[in-house]
């Protein structure tokens, strides 16, 4: 498979768009090798994969133009996953995967306010639907986290008040289980074939078998 140069002045890993399955596709949209990760933003296995994989995946594969990487946020852990998915969705498509990477990098500390404030979070989720996720994210400390990473508090509140978009995210996420038959996270698919392993070593080997090297 031949390399494809990126548009002048850019790397393929800086270019992203939304897909028709509510994924964030990074790289050459016409790349011959298409890799999908179904991941949860609060999944320790997804965080471990991210720490191993993201640098070589982007530099050695996506930037060649041979491989595109699509992340589909599978919100299997309820309101916290839905809120985080809406927040990575709040900026431009090119911000979504880097924001997901930063969530995974801080995952050991991120759920602490969620565990400590369960009563307040339950109260937030009982509010009208255009208020509940704003209150949930404020209580969980998520607005501070994203404000430090380029999504302002006002921008985040506006996104989290959009009940229609949150409902869309939940429906797409449900379809990953019912329609795509995804049973856990992380799950990887390369050119339509689901991989058995979840390690970077097994994913990289599959990319190479597909012609990425």
Model-derived features with residue positions:
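Periplasmic c-type cytochrome electron-transfer domains
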Residues: 3-18, 101-103, 130-140
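Functionally engaged cysteine thiol sites
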Residues: 16, 90, 159
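Solvent-exposed, acidic/flexible segments
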Residues: 32, 46-50, 73-81, 92-96, ...
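A short alpha-helix capping/helix-coil boundary motif
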Residues: 36-38, 120-124, 152-154
